[in-house]
Amino acid sequence: MLNRMAMVSGLENDPVMKREKEWSVQGLYTYTTPLFKEAGLSDYRLLRLLQEDRENNTDLYYTLKVYLLNENNVTMAADSLHIHRNTLVYRLKQIRECIEADINDNETARELLAFMMMYDISRQDEKRQK
């Protein structure tokens, strides 16, 4: 059993394994999103953030998504967004104030990212249906 665990842990950085994991997650969200949508489930924090983006022409939703996808690493997220680290820190402060949540709390971060993925997939589905 330890040999199998060592083999799997050794493949974490393998591009094929990463792609398989991404497809699995994408598939999970693709099939569960309609159920959440049908039940009327959404996250008020993200709705508030999207409203802030619409009203003030900000990009806080995308900023938060990139930050969470980079495992709350400010340096990596700033690089991904092609912005200065201090700019990201300022945006994260705005996000915290807007959604009134600790985005560095693991459970909160997972919830937000899960709802973001479902929201993004539902938007893609809506675009395809048009």
Residue ranges and their predicted role:
Residues M1-K130:
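Cytosolic nucleotide-utilizing catalytic cores of signal-transduction proteins
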